[in-house]
Amino acid sequence: MAQVAKKILVTCALPYANGSIHLGHMLEHIQADIWVRFQRMRGNQVHFICADDAHGTPIMLKAQQMGIEPEQMIAEMSQEHQQDFAGFAISYDNYHSTHSDENRELSSLIYGRLKANGYIKNRTISQLYDPEKGMFLPDRFVKGTCPKCKAPEQYGDNCEVCGATYSPTELIDPKSAVSGATPVMRESEHFFFDLPAFSDMLQAWTRSGALQEQVANKMQEWFDSGLQQWDITRDAPYFGFEVPDAPGKYFYVWLDAPIGYMGAFKNLCDKRGDLDFDEFWGKDAKTDLYHFIGKDIVYFHSLFWPAMLEGSNFRKPTNLFVHGYVTVNGAKMSKSRGTFIKAGTYLKYLDADCLRYYYAAKLSSRIDDIDLNLEDFVQRVNADIVNKVVNLASRNAGFINKRFAGQLADQLADPVLYKTFTDAATSIADAYNNRESGKAIREIMALADVANRYVDEQAPWVVAKQEGHDADLHAICSMGINLFRVLMTYLKPVLPSLTERTEAFLNTELTWDSIEQPLLGHSITAFKALFNRIDLDKVNEMVASSKEDMAPATRVTGPLADDPIQETISFDDFAKVDMRIALIQQAEFVEGSDKLLKLTLELGGETRQIFSGIRSAYPDPKALEGRMTVMVANLAPRKMRFGVSEGMVMTAGPGGSDIFLLSPDSGAQPGMQVK
């Protein structure tokens, strides 16, 4: 009995409409597109949607800086985003915006239902207010000195140096990041979503299979620490949707942003007329709903979003598919190094299929970060796509075209070998379906090695010179072309542009169900180059064109200018600080934090655990193990969300990827005092 086609709705996280798409963004859109293309090849009905996240204070302020209205800015940004996604062959059925009539109506509907069901609470809160701009300041628009480690220029929600979290009112010497003014405290009534009311439902949903194990474990930490009511409103001025019957109050961007998934699909339904919105979003929907997201927005998608849907009588997602971050050459993307590469810049220099293949080869169902090593990128694409796959076609097509008028043989030279290739369809399909594209690629390339070994052993270039062996030559080369066809069918979800050229060359569509039947007595077209090798010089040009001079042209820069020397202290004050040499025994990531590393330090007879905000500069923590460093040993232990930090390691630098762990001269031993 034929398998019943599934009805599936797939979304990617909505790109924020205040900046360009870069190669970090593209990981998610490529991963989702590969999965969608595979599902379509298997006969499932997939609707693939996305939209720009177009609301919030950052967009309002950036538009002001540009001297244009927010509506104009987000329209221009949407056009750029859609052009980039089209350039990478992301097969969206609809790309919309959260600043839309559909989203306004759905946001108001969901809010109204939540309010009617008793899940909206009113509370007066105190907030920092910019007296010059006449606006309340979100956390990220306040900067000051960290109340924990005293690091300057930290945002109002957490410290990028020590990893501490706090409220903006706890900052020392806070300043508005908008105007530079000293903010004042003002009270305002806000509306809160009663998230704790959904704790039992969320805990059951967490363990229902809707989340990866890593995500479910992280959520358990949030449950253990207790859920809090969620502030869903912001005060004017704000670019977004005004709350019904509450003049001057606006929905917080994270309320209407996920509703944008629904708005984009509603817009598609209205365009097509053959889709039923409720079939995919109704409370008892039997269709599948999948969200591809990055690990940085798990909190919103795994807690607030399903709770909002439950409380407003809509269905919850079938699954969240969470991925990690992208690093380039082992480090965080950097504008100064040219590794912060925009999607549009990439497309000026390289084929989109190259990046699609490289990401596919590295992706799995886990939340691990992926490193785009540019030298490895060049080597892998050239070795796999050009040397193994495309070369298989070029080695055989010439003989078929010249000696046999483009006609393939009527019989397979090696039916057993061909069956080996088609038998792999099940395991490769399982890998794609489970988002293990890296596993699928490894299996496909292993088959490519077998195919090339077959051609090497049969040596058609030798057979071509032997009289009376035309039938053998015909059979060998036809076998090679058929193996190439199977490989390209397996690679079709990953390489859409190469697939299109391949289908034109083979004069047939590549479908999963047709590979059981080889191409026999079939006419192919004249072979043309299907894929070009990557030139490392092109990659270097791309990097060079992505470099930005990060230094402001109008002021003197340097460590002292950026970070002035603090006021003078007495020797007695300094003597209170006990700094010691420490050996880093172990360094590891902290699950749930994209800024912290957990360090186990040995001080010569004593072991300490420290959480340090240096992850952005040291993406491979294992490289720190065995290294000597300097730590403040008599700092009071500090309880953090992830455990107790028993000191602080000494670093230099402004932050981000420019953090430098201090090390002693050779000969220093763990436990020695730094004087």
UniProtKB/Swiss-Prot annotation:
UniProt-annotated binding residues for Zn(2+): C146, C149, C159, C162
Reactions catalysed: tRNA(Met) + L-methionine + ATP = L-methionyl-tRNA(Met) + AMP + diphosphate
Cofactors: Zn(2+)
Superkingdom of source: Bacteria
Top-level EC class as recorded in UniProt: ligase
Any one Gene Ontology cellular component term annotated for this protein: cytosol
Principal location class: cytoplasm
UniProt GO MF annotations: ATP binding; metal ion binding; methionine-tRNA ligase activity; tRNA binding
Note accompanying the cofactor annotation: Binds 1 zinc ion per subunit.
Function field: Is required not only for elongation of protein synthesis but also for the initiation of all mRNA translation through initiator tRNA(fMet) aminoacylation.
Family to which the UniProt record says this protein belongs: Belongs to the class-I aminoacyl-tRNA synthetase family. MetG type 1 subfamily.
Name used for this protein in its record: Methionine--tRNA ligase
Organism field: Yersinia pseudotuberculosis serotype I (strain IP32953)
Organism classification: Bacteria, Pseudomonadati, Pseudomonadota, Gammaproteobacteria, Enterobacterales
